[in-house]
């Protein structure tokens, strides 16, 4: 049986001056007479003959090589392999062998040069919902000011840190977390191994979640105001930590001066057809503003308006640019529901405006990290390079949920085996370049989902498997605050509980696992920058290997009973002296002995 081996990393892809050397390994019987490298120049398909190499990379392994000219053409170099016999042909792509030529966007792809933020793939991100992470002392009186929350029809509720979260008035209940509280807890985050923070919205807004922006140019006084963000920026820089903000540009809040539903005298668009901001929103014939998904407090912004476009992203002091400049110097934006942003109350010309946001950000801060929020398929935006990455729900979170927690995003039952899970993950990332895969934003859960610990239910023993997976799969791992100490909770608002700072309320063994996995990732170039090959996926067991030059990291996930797994022969496993770095599995002569419900990591 013929087998082919290729990953878009060294030793298979190497740059030599103005050429990119592409190598394919073959093992097994019935080798082809010829191999052509299918590549493209300015979107035109080309076939380049590959040459069989005299030297073998390993005994029994044959290498074929060809070169791609880098002196011209687009930076994203897509390619696949056409194997030819005298009477037939087969194609080899990221998803294996096929009798059909691959779709253009499902080939191997590398970016040379890579214009994305070079720092992103090395990070350990930590997502913070500011009101629920840490409360600073002393506090300004303005931070605990009680006001009427129009969207909820009541005054906001202030609670003590240890009071339980309830379903009542979820968007109006405040626990007092703030940005100075985050600053005070940076030593804790440093101890965990965190290198970058992603904050849910911090700008002035009436709700606790702040997705109903009232002022894009000032931090909410409840969080400590502009000064607290400056202090946090300074403190994170002192520790070498990155800081990414949440940009809510699909809609504003209805209390924003631009809209002014509640008649505060700003001349907003809601009640004033002559308002200078009237065309920043869309209205039906009866004068009702078009909103986001039926939430009247979140009127949609209309990007048909040139003046709105200038205010949000195009202008020299636009909102997007403002927070990336000194003295703020933020490291990027997470773009809320970015796929829905557009014109005339909908998503018309969405791609044009998302590209404009990213272009403005990169002009201001070339290394800015732009992450789009997509619960669905984000590849359309990624393939068009209008985002650096997406929150990887579709390519990581949801298949992992299906395999370990047997549920989907609608919390409906979903039973999938290892083969289905890996086919799902591999199919999704096949549409992305290698560098894009490394920048995808991977999470087990977030402020918009139930906590993964809660989703597991009676299968709570599988939680460590997910943690190991998070730090070993291609992409940027992000911890949702509190996951590392065992915080649980169903969907909003229960997934937004205050952080349990009392040690007796923390799962210290889980915290230690997070620390170990973060340390492993930081030590391993293969985990941060390597390719990924699934070696085995059947029933309850997933085995994959990360590869970069001579570095190897082998990962085995077993959600079921103790078992033995015979790995298929692979040159990725040959001549490797393995050391077990996490877990208790054993590897002997290509046979894995895996304990029940376990995750094991080996490195060479």
From Swiss-Prot:
Compartmental location:
Cytoplasm
Show the catalytic activity.
Hydrolysis of terminal, non-reducing (1->4)-linked alpha-D-glucose residues with release of alpha-D-glucose
Question: Which superkingdom is the protein from?
Answer: Bacteria
Site (described: Transition state stabilizer): 448
Q: Which GO terms describe its biological process?
A: alpha-glucan catabolic process; maltose metabolic process
- Active-site residue list: 336, 373
* InterPro entries assigned: Glyco_hydro_13_cat_dom, Glyco_hydro_13_lg-like_dom, Glyco_hydro_b, Glycoside_hydrolase_SF, Ig_E-set, MalZ
An example of a Gene Ontology cellular component annotation for this protein is: cytoplasm
Instruction: Provide the alphabetized UniProt keywords.
Output: Cytoplasm, Glycosidase, Hydrolase, Maltose metabolism
Instruction: Supply one GO molecular-function term.
Output: protein homodimerization activity
**PANTHER family per record:** ALPHA-AMYLASE FAMILY MEMBER (PTHR10357), MALTODEXTRIN GLUCOSIDASE (PTHR10357:SF210)
Similarity section: Belongs to the glycosyl hydrolase 13 family.
What this protein is called in its record is Maltodextrin glucosidase
Organism of provenance = Escherichia coli (strain K12)
């Amino acid at each position: 049986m013929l087998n082919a081996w290729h990953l878009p990393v060294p030793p298979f892809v190497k740059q030599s001056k103005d050429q990119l050397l592409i190598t394919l390994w073959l093992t097994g019987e019935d080798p082809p007479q010829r191999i052509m490298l299918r590549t493209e120049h300015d979107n035109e398909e080309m076939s380049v003959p590959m040459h069989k190499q005299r030297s073998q990379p390993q005994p029994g392994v044959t290498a074929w090589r060809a070169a791609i000219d880098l002196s011209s053409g687009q930076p994203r170099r897509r390619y696949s392999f056409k194997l030819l016999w005298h009477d037939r042909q087969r194609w080899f792509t990221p998803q294996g062998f096929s009798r059909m030529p691959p779709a253009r966007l499902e080939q191997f792809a590398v970016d040379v040069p890579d214009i994305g933020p070079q720092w992103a793939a090395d990070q350990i991100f930590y997502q913070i919902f500011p009101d629920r992470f840490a409360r600073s002392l002393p506090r300004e009186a303005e931070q605990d000011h009680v006001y009427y929350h129009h969207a909820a029809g009541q005054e906001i509720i202030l609670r003590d840190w240890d009071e339980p979260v309830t379903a009542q008035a979820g968007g109006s209940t405040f626990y007092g977390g703030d940005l100075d509280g985050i600053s005070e807890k940076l030593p804790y985050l440093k101890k965990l191994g965190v290198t970058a923070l992603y904050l849910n919205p911090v700008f002035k807004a009436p709700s606790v979640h702040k997705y109903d922006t009232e002022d894009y140019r000032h931090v909410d006084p409840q969080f400590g105001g502009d000064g607290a963000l400056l202090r946090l920026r300074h403190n994170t820089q002192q520790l070498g930590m990155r800081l990414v903000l949440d940009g809510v540009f699909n809609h504003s809040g209805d209390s924003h001066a631009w809209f002014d539903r509640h008649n505060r005298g700003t001349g907003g668009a809601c009640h004033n057809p002559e308002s200078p901001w009237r065309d920043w929103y869309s209205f039906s014939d009866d004068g009702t503003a078009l909103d986001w998904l039926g939430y009247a407090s979140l009127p949609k912004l209309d990007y048909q308006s040139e003046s709105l476009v200038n205010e949000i992203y195009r202008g020299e002091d636009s909102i997007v640019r403002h927070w990336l400049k000194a003295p703020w110097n933020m490291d990027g934006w997470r773009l809320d529901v970015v796929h829905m942003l557009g014109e005339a109350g909908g998503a018309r010309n969405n791609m044009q405006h998302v590209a404009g946001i990213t272009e403005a950000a990169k002009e201001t801060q070339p290394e800015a990290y732009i992450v789009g929020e997509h619960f669905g398929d984000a590849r359309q935006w990624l393939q068009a390079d209008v985002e650096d990455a997406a929150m990887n729900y579709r390519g990581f979170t949801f298949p992992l949920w299906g395999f370990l927690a047997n549920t989907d995003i609608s919390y409906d039952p979903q039973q999938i085996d290892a083969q289905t899970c890996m086919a799902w993950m591999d199919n999704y990332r096949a549409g992305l370049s290698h560098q894009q895969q490394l920048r995808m934003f991977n999470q087990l859960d977030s402020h918009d989902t139930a906590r993964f610990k809660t989703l597991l239910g009676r299968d709570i023993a599988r939680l460590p498997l997910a943690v190991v997976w998070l730090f070993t799969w291609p992409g940027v791992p992000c911890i949702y605050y509190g996951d590392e100490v065992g915080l649980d909770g169903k969907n909003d608002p229960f997934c937004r509980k205050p952080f349990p700072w009392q040690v007796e309320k923390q799962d210290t063994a889980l915290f230690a696992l997070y620390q170990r996995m973060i340390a492993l990732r930081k030590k391993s170039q293969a985990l941060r920058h390597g390719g990924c090959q699934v070696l085995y996926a059947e029933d309850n067991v997933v085995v994959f290997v990360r590869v970069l030059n001579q570095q190897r990291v082998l990962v085995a996930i077993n959600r079921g009973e103790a078992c033995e797994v015979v790995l298929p022969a692979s040159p990725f496993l040959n001549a490797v002296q393995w050391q077990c770095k996490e877990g208790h599995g054993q590897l002997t002569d290509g046979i894995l002995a895996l304990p029940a419900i376990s995750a094991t990591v080996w490195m060479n």
